[in-house]
Structure formats: C-alpha cells, structure tokens
From Swiss-Prot:
Protein name: A-type ATP synthase subunit B
The organism's taxonomic lineage, starting at the top: Archaea, Methanobacteriati, Methanobacteriota, Stenosarchaea group, Halobacteria
Matches recorded under NCBIfam families: ATP_syn_B_arch, PRK04196.1
Subcellular location as annotated: Cell membrane
GO CC aspect terms: plasma membrane; proton-transporting two-sector ATPase complex, catalytic domain
Name of the gene: atpB
Domain of life: Archaea
Protein family (similarity comment): Belongs to the ATPase alpha/beta chains family.
GO terms under biological process: proton motive force-driven plasma membrane ATP synthesis
Length: 471
C-alpha cells in the first residue's frame, strides 16, 4: 500500500495527485480527510509523476491536506449465490438492512470479453409475458435487445413488468428433479429518482420477484462516478450466476442515457476533447464493453441476456446514444408516444422494432411451429392498416373498399387487443399466438398469403371469420 499527501487539485469528481512511482490504471484508492472521513476512488489516468482519481462518493470535504492510499488492486465485486433477494447501492453495498455479504469470490468488475470461438450462438426463447415482444420481436437467450423510449414514456413500468414476468418456458416445465438451469434477474438502475426507486422496490417486494433478483440502485443524487460503476457491478454479478452457478440471467439496465451523461460529465471534468454532442469519443467502445458481456459460453449451462433501456433525448433515434447502441446490439424495441397518448400499455410500436435473432429462438420445439408465419402476417396486415390510416385522412373512410376497411379494423383491434394488455397481464406464448390467430381470422383465408396452408387449416378461427363477414 502506497500513501501520499500530495494532492495538487480537486476539480468536480476528480482529484489530482503527484506520485513518485508508477500507479496502475483502474487501481482502487482510499482518500482520508483530516476529520477521518474515508472516500473510495479509482485511478482514471496515470502518467509519470501524475495521477487523476475519480471519487465515488464525491469530493466534498476533500482538500490538499487529505491522505491518498493506493491499494494495489482494481475494483472488485463480492459475488455469491446469496446475492439473490438483495438490494445494493450503485457501488455494490447492501442497502436493504440485511446482513453483510459473505462472498464466495471477489471478481474484477471490468470483466473479460468472451472468446468469440467459445461463444455459443444465442438461441432458445425467453418469455417476457408481453405480446408485443414475445410474438413480434422475440427475445432470445444470450441476446442483447435494447428498449428505446422517450422522456415521460412508461419504460420503468415495462422494465418492472419484464423483471416480474420473464421466464424460460422449458425450465417452468421441468419436473421436481431440479434438473436444468434456474432463471434469475439482475436489475441495474442508474440515475433514477427516489420516487422511482421506491416504486421499483414496492413492486419487487409485493410481487415476490425480489426472491430471484439482485437489484442495484444508483439514485439521481448519487455521484456521477458511481453511475459508471453500477452496470459493471450488475454484469459481474450476472456473469457469476450464469457461468459459475448455471443460472439463465436476464440483465435489465435502466437508464443508459443517465450512464452516458455521467461519461460526458466526467469527460468534461478531465477537459477531454468532446465528440458528437459533447459525449466522449470513446463512448462507442465503452458501451460495447457493457453490451458485449451478454451471451452464452460453450460448455456452460447458464447464459446472460441483456435488456438495456434508454430514453432518446427529444425522441431522436439519431442521437449518439441510441445510434451507437443500435450498432452494437441485436435489434431494438421502440416505445411510441402516440400509442401512449391513446392509452395503449405498454406502448410498443412493433413496426420499427426488430429482434435480429428472433428466427433462431422460435418455431417447433422452441415456441410453436406457426410462430414465424403468424408474426409475418401480423406485421404485413398492421403495416397495411397503418398506410390506410394515412389515406383515410385524405379521402375519408367512405371512399375505401370493404377490404381496406377490414384492414383498418384490424389495425385498431391489433392495438387494442394484442398490444394493449396493461402492465399487470402476463400472457404466455400460447395465449399470444392464439390471440394473433383470432385477429388474423378477420380476413378470408386467401388474404393470409404469408402463412402455410396447413397452419391455416389447423389454427384459423372460423367463428371470427363468420362474424367479420357478417359485419
């Protein structure tokens, strides 16, 4: 351990120290003020005779008379299976009044990239209970699928719904012999308000979801530096549960926009040359280091699946945060302000949404043999209904044909019955696909040109078709 009393400057969350020997990058630091307060920090920059330290608890009370101790190790997360059911702050310290954590191991939070040769291709279905995701943009085990939201949209409610309802159907079907991997959720909240934190905790405790979850909470009034640590703590915990304890882990990170704002704030304090819109030029690399920690490893039973949630400033999907996120991840779920204003919950707009790995996680033996065809036909019918809505604004509904009016009715029913399920309803994939067939049966069989004829014979609902014809 090396100790110095050579602080030269304190600037925002950063402390600058003169040293007479090399100090390691990312090394953990303790800063003790004259009145005995101890703050933790991390080496952000190290050069000959000079070190910049980012302080997790903020630099209030730190002056040039403070002592700086370099501990000779990087930041580590104490990991154990007993973390399930616990609530921690953004730095990994318990805040739920429970006992201290007795770790099985202490793991570097930076993590290591999964060897591409050792990666298994993501496949197998994760059920969220949300039809707009399960039916149309299926989440696959080992995937990273972000949710793009906007300010004021209920992305927090959707995050809680997914955390509460998510499951691996094949594990639900396991018998009592305890074979197979269990399912767990790691929930990392960054820069949230105290009101949101209370809402999250009330929901987790009321629904019993906390028992299979590890929750990390970084509040809006916590230091920005801690915000950069929180997702790494969460992912380190998820990797331990997945690859050491064979859990299938779903990691929900909200809000990644707050994380990127913390990067910008720290970059400004360091007087770095800014990139697009003031964000640091290395933000793409930084985000990739987080998102690429999702996946499956050959020979390991567990998996890490990620749902990062971000709010697009000004609903702009070309903003650097959603833009760079889209390059790294495997699709996106888009929330829509117009649907939200109509009272549709969750307001998921399926048309611009995409799950690039969906085809690998659906079909016979995974969900159901008709899943792909049903999804394709629902997309096509809803897209045509949306186009006709624009036409109605010009010529009026009376000018449209019977066929066109049927597509308009379908679009209305699709939003009202398929998408709008509320935040409390948990639909399994069978219910979702059956509902899809009920809606598609509004059309004559000849209109279902994206569905195999055998599947039409098996699932087409004749009663609905008769009602539609009568109308």
């Amino acid at each position: 351990m090396k100790e110095y009393q050579t602080i030269t400057e304190v600037s925002g969350p950063l402390v600058y120290v003169e040293t007479d020997e090399p100090i390691g990058y990312d090394e953990i630091v303790e800063i003790e003020t004259p009145n005995g307060d101890v703050k933790r920090g991390q080496v952000l920059e190290s050069s000959d005779g000079f070190v910049a330290i980012q302080v997790f608890e903020g630099t209030e009370g730190v002056g040039k008379d403070a002592s700086v101790r370099f501990l000779g190790e990087t930041l580590k997360m104490p990991v154990t299976e007993d973390l399930l059911g616990r609530v921690l702050d953004g730095s990994g310290n318990p805040i739920d009044g429970g006992p201290d954590i007795v770790p099985d191991d202490r793991v570097d939070i930076v993590g290591e990239a999964i060897n591409p040769h050792a990666r298994e291709y993501p496949e197998e279905f994760i059920q969220t209970g949300v039809s707009g995701i399960d039916g149309m943009n299926t989440l696959v085990r080992g995937q990273k699928l972000p949710i793009f939201s906007g300010s004021g949209l209920p992305h927090s409610d959707l995050a809680l719904q997914i955390a509460r309802q998510a499951s691996v159907p094949e594990e639900e079907a396991e018998t009592d012999d305890d074979e197979g991997s269990e399912f767990a959720v790691v929930f990392g909240a960054m820069g949230i308000t105290a009101e949101e934190a209370n809402e999250f905790m009330d929901d987790f405790e009321r629904t019993g979801a906390l028992e299979r979850s590890v929750v990390f909470m970084n509040l809006a009034d916590d230091p920005a530096v801690e915000r950069t640590v929180t997702p790494r703590m969460a992912l380190t915990t998820a990797e331990y549960l997945a690859f050491e304890k064979d859990y299938h882990v779903l990691v929900i990170l909200t809000d990644m926009t707050n994380y990127c704002e913390a990067l910008r704030q720290i970059g400004a304090a360091r007087e770095e040359v800014p990139g697009r819109r003031g964000y640091p030029g290395y933000m793409y690399t930084d985000l990739a280091q987080l998102y690429e920690r999702a996946g499956r490893i050959e020979g390991k039973e567990g998996s890490v699946t990620q749902i990062p949630i971000l709010t697009m400033p000004g609903d702009d999907d070309t903003h650097p945060i959603p833009d760079l996120t889209g390059y790294i991840t495997e699709g996106q779920i888009m929330m829509n302000r117009d649907l939200n204003s109509q009272g549709v919950t969750p307001p998921v707009n399926v048309l611009p949404s995409l799950s690039r790995l969906m085809d690998d996680g659906i079909g016979e033996g995974l969900t159901r043999a008709d899943h792909g065809d049903v999804s394709d036909q629902l997309y096509a019918a809803y897209a045509e209904g949306e186009e006709l809505r624009d036409l109605v604004n010009i010529v009026g509904r009376e000018a449209l044909s019977e066929r066109d009016n049927r597509y308009l009715d379908f679009a209305d029913r699709f939003e009202a019955e398929f998408i709008d399920q509320g935040f409390k309803t948990n639909r399994d994939i069978e219910e979702t696909l059956d509902l899809g067939w009920e809606l598609l049966s509004m059309f004559p069989k000849t209109e279902l040109n994206r569905v195999d004829e055998d599947l039409i014979e098996d699932h087409y609902v004749e009663d609905v078709a008769d009602e539609a014809t009568a109308d």
